[in-house]
Amino acid sequence: SSKVIHLHGELTKVRPEDSYTEADVYDESRVKDIGYSAIGIGNVDERGVQYRPHIVFFGEAVPKLSDALRELVEADIMIIVGTSLVVQPAASLWQFTPVDCPVYVVDPEDTPIDREESVIHIKDKATTGVARAIEMLKKENIKQKNR
């Protein structure tokens, strides 16, 4: 994809606990990629501020929400991975895609949008379900080229 938005952050990154502004937007320049290294109490930045996972916890604002909305209104394909599609505001984002945009949901459990016509639900875990979604997209692309 040309635009992948990690709506709830990334577990391979950390940021200082004080990195949010009053507008609930984090300072991207203070985000640090740590790969799969552990982070714990005492892991601090150069100012002595404790690092925390670069993810959105329950009750926190979703800083990438407006970015996601801007991209979704022009999306050709949407792939949603590993979510119950119950918690708002993220649960409603798929509704902002164009009418002809296929929405793939990769999650082993049922979701509230399974019966929607544009939704293709791949009931599988992310590690294998995303690969299945890609294969389905490749086949669909071949069909469209042969028309």
List the model feature ranges, each with a label.
Residues S1-R147:
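Conserved catalytic alpha/beta core of Sir2/sirtuin-type deacylases, generalized to analogous enzyme cores
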